[in-house]
Every structure is written in structure tokens, then in C-alpha cells.
UniProtKB/Swiss-Prot annotation:
One of its GO terms (molecular function) is tRNA binding. The gene is trm1. This is tRNA (guanine(26)-N(2))-dimethyltransferase. It comes from the Archaea. Residues 1-369 form the Trm1 methyltransferase domain. NCBIfam families: PRK04338.1-1, TRM1. InterPro entries: SAM-dependent_MTases_sf, Trm1, TRM1_arc_bac, tRNA_met_Trm1_C. It comes from Halorubrum lacusprofundi (strain ATCC 49239 / DSM 5036 / JCM 8891 / ACAM 34). Zn(2+) binds at C237, C240, C257, C260. GO terms for biological process: tRNA N2-guanine methylation. Gene3D superfamilies: N2,N2-dimethylguanosine tRNA methyltransferase, C-terminal domain, Vaccinia Virus protein VP39. It is an enzyme of class 2 (transferase). Belongs to the class I-like SAM-binding methyltransferase superfamily. Trm1 family.
Length: 381
């Protein structure tokens, strides 16, 4: 069957009975990842302005070839690789059907990457990208784009699996989407550092059961060390929601929460504690979203939020805070405005509609929010 995406027409598998369109047996196509692909195209457009020499693109798990086709339409010298010969054939047909140049290769991507160098490598596997991370980060020149769909291990819901795959201890906290993203980036940064490379996230997001990050590479032991310095641990109180990030690779967990005295404190790490995006680049990516994209509205909203988001290592769930405070919640925009009015930095966060970031501690937030409510009640009298 044929589908249209980003102004292009590609053939995808027929749907099985009861399955979503295009998700039939054999070659896989995921229609729910259109937002992911739209943002990827916008990133490729913006990155060409940032690094004009970046010209070659590897779609490392091509399947139908939709990512490679869209990259080729942007003028990238595209290679589509897959271990499934049917996928390679379908990707070639889709390139030809759109009058686009590109190479299709029946190869294991790890072997391919140790024989060829690409400016941009896109890893979009089913599940964890870790089996492909070494080859990609060691051999890409400029940019590695990574999707992870195994969100339960990443966020700590499947703790042992997360430890095995990512070499970190993720914890299932009230900010679990961000926990997963920072666990993923930590593993990728540590992998790149083994090859004396810095891997810095310039755009990242968590959407619909997957995490996605775009890592810009720079060679050199010193810059790799600088990235390692952005790793650390976070102590989290399960009762009052206190959390404390600490940079460094040696954990020093606390026994009790310094705010409420609870001994239910979880320590997570090593996590990436640095920014997950470059705000200027995120804004540039947003500007390169075009109306022919099926998820243009969502992409612009997402990227706008990412660009404005504070780079503090964790977000708070406003509903969870109000539950702890025993008060009815106010609107999110008013919540953020009250924090800013009290002198704290604050922003919404893209992870969910009730996600907020602030430089205020939880007691400071409570005073800023509920104190204002008390003042408002007094004025009304």
C-alpha cells in the first residue's frame, strides 16, 4: 500500500488484520512515528546550516526506507541499510519511485560502519540502540540521531534490564520520562568517550513511548572529558519528592531525606545532568518545520517547549505536587507565572502537559504558590 508523508509517496506493507495501516508482517513501518520523522527532517535542514560540510546520511535500520527517502529529498547523499533483503528491495523501490538518488545495502549496520564513514548516522531500532552505539559513535563524523523505544528499562520500571543495557541505575520516579532520556544520553556519552569523542545533545525529546536524541560529535580527549564531567547522580525522596543532583562518577547517597527525614531515598545514575538541547538550535529546527509535514503543528509546539525549557536535571509533575500539598491545582501557566513572580526561574517542560521545571526547591515552590493563594484570599476579603 502507498502512503504520503512529507510530500513524498512511499510503499509500505499491507496491514495485518487488526493492525495499524502499514504494520503488516515482514518489513516494518510505524505510522505513529511520523512526528519523530518530521522532527528528524527539520533537524537535518537546520544542521546543514550549522555544519555545511555534513552531506552523507545513513538510515541504519531502513525497513521501508522512509527515513532515507526523506533525507534524500533534502539533498543528503543517502544510504539505506538493513539485514532484511526484502527491506533493502523496498527501500530501493521507494527511492526510485520518488526520483531520488541513494544507495541501498544489504548489510549488518555494525559491519557497514566499520568500513564506511558517514556524516550523519540515524539509529532507529526496535528496542534499545545500545548494540549499535559503539559502531555509530566511533565512526560517524558529525551527528548521531538515536531513538530508544525500551522506555521501561530506561526509566527504571524494569530496573535490572536498565542496569544491564545502559550501565546505570535508573529509578522509577515521578519524572520518569526525563529519567529515561538522561539514562540514554549518559550511556551514549560514555560510549563516545571511549573513542575520545564528545557527544553533546543538541535536541532531545520524549514522545509517545520513545526517547529521541541528536548528538553532535567532536573529537578529542579533553572535550570527551568535558562531557564526562556532565555525568552524575540524583538522590530522590519518594515521600516529599525532594531531589538533589550531584556531578561526578562516585555516588555518595544519603541515608535520609534532609527535608522530611524519610529513609525512602533512591539514588539514580550515572545520568546525564547537562542540557538535553541547545536552545538556539532547537529554535532553528522549529523554523525548519514546514506545513507539508503531517505532524507540523505538534512538531512546532514540541520544539518551542524544548527551546524554552530550563536545563535543570529534573522536572516536577504539577499534579503530584498538589497531591502532596493537599490542595486543588491551578492552571499550568499561572503556576509558572507565580514561581517567576517569586523570583525563581521556571518553565514548562515537554515531557507531559503538567511538567514544570524551576530553580526553586519544593518547599520554596509551596511557599511561592500557596502563599500567593493565601494572599489572594486575603485581598478578596
Amino acid at each position: 500500500m502507498d502512503i504520503e508523508e512529507g510530500g513524498l509517496t512511499v510503499s509500505v506493507p499491507e496491514a495485518r488484520d487488526g493492525a495499524s495501516e502499514g504494520t503488516g508482517g515482514g518489513v516494518f513501518f510505524n505510522p505513529t512515528q511520523e512526528l519523530n520523522r518530521d522532527v528528524t527532517v527539520a533537524v537535518l535542514r537546520a544542521y546543514r546550516d550549522r555544519e555545511p560540510r555534513a552531506s552523507s546520511y545513513l538510515d541504519a535500520m531502513a525497513a521501508s526506507g522512509i527515513r532515507g527517502v526523506r533525507a534524500a529529498a533534502e539533498g543528503y547523499d543517502t544510504t539505506c541499510a538493513d539485514v532484511d533483503p526484502d527491506a533493502v528491495e523496498l527501500a530501493a523501490e521507494n527511492l526510485a519511485a520518488n526520483d531520488l538518488d541513494g544507495e541501498t545495502v544489504h548489510r549488518d549496520v555494525n559491519a557497514l560502519l566499520y568500513e564506511n564513514v558517514f556524516d550523519v548516522v540515524d539509529l532507529d531500532p526496535y528496542g534499545t540502540p545500545i548494540p549499535f552505539a559503539d559502531a555509530a559513535l566511533a565512526n560517524a563524523r558529525n551527528l548521531v540521531c538515536v531513538t530508544a523505544t525500551d522506555t521501561a528499562p530506561l526509566c527504571g520500571a524494569h530496573l535490572n534490564s536498565g542496569i544491564r543495557k545502559y550501565g546505570a541505575v535508573p529509578r522509577n520516579t515521578d519524572y520518569h520520562p526525563e529519567m529515561g532520556l538522561r539514562t540514554l544520553i549518559s550511556a551514549l556519552v560514555r560510549t563516545a568517550a571511549r573513542y575520545d569523542k564528545a557527544a553533546r545533545p543538541i535536541v532531545s525529546h520524549v514522545s509517545r513511548h520513545y526517547a529521541r536524541t541528536y548528538l553532535e560529535l567532536e573529537s578529542g580527549a579533553q572535550v570527551a572529558d568535558d562531557c564526562i564531567d556532565e555525568l552524575g547522580y540524583i538522590d530522590n525522596c519518594e515521600d516529599c519528592l525532594w531531589r538533589d543532583p550531584t556531578h561526578g562518577l562516585i555516588a555518595d547517597p544519603v541515608d535520609t531525606c534532609p527535608v522530611c527525614g524519610s529513609d525512602r531515598v533512591l539514588t539514580a545514575g550515572p545520568l546525564w545532568l547537562g542540557p538535553v538541547a541547545d536552545p538556539d538550535f532547537a529554535r532553528a529546527v522549529r523554523e525548519r518545520v514546514t506545513d507539508d509535514m503531517g505532524e507540523a503543528k505538534r512538531a512546532r509546539k514540541l520544539l518551542g517547549t524544548v527551546a524554552r525549557e530550563l536545563d535543570t536535571p529534573t522536572h516536577y509533575d504539577q499534579h503530584r505536587l498538589y497531591k502532596a500539598w493537599g490542595e486543588p491545582a491551578i492552571g499550568m501557566d499561572e503556576f509558572v507565572d507565580r514561581l517567576r513572580g517569586a523570583g525563581y526561574e521556571a518553565s514548562r517542560a515537554h515531557y507531559r502537559g503538567t511538567a514544570v521545571k524551576s530553580t526553586a526547591s519544593i518547599p520554596e515552590m509551596r511557599d511561592a504558590i500557596l502563599g500567593n493563594e493565601g494572599d489572594a484570599d486575603g485581598d478578596a476579603d
